[in-house]
Amino acid sequence: NLVKSSVENYTDLTTPLWLKNCDSSAITADDTIFCSTEEEGNKAFRNFEERGVETWIAQSHQNGDLIKFYGVEGTDFFHWNYASLGHSKFGHEKVNGKEKGYQFCADKIKRYADKMAQKLNVPIYGGDVIIDEKGDFWFIDFNDFPSFSICREKAAKAIALRIVQ
């Protein structure tokens, strides 16, 4: 669902979309901006330009259930939960609304997440996926060494095992 990934020629983007600052990790709510209209998109781009953001991506918005996941590549550990059950960093979860409980295969998400972890050399990871009504999913975020706060005790054993491997 990647739409663009440079500061050139952003006038042909279609909303709704998410504009994400790639110069650094998301520190403020303005580093990841939901744009439901072209006007909001233009405002978000002006915000990035004023802040000197040079590298960004625009992702098309996907409707569905927002799932947070945590994993440790090379182990059996994988935890997921609906975004509404955990801590909200900036409140962007509200865009997709209340989860509908769409069915999906967590093992399949784990397999793909482990492949990304291997390619990126990020064995201790977390992220977000959107699940649609058919059970299809889109990775929308992938992080190295997230907090694991919602599953800390179970994760600690897998993290320790992975570190000594």
Report residues per predicted region.
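A short glycine-rich, hydrophobically flanked beta-strand micro-motif that places a catalytic Asp/Glu
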Residues: W56, I67, V122-K134
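Protein kinase-like catalytic core scaffold
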Residues: L17, F77-F78, Y125, W138-D141
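Residue-level signal for tight coil/turn positions that link beta-strands
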Residues: T14, E73-G74, K134
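C-terminal active-site "lid" helix and adjoining low-complexity regulatory extension at the edge
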Residues: F104, Q118-V122, I131-Q165
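Phosphate-binding site of ATP-dependent enzymes
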Residues: D30-L120
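A conserved helix-loop-beta module that forms one wall/lid of the active-site cleft
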Residues: N1-T32
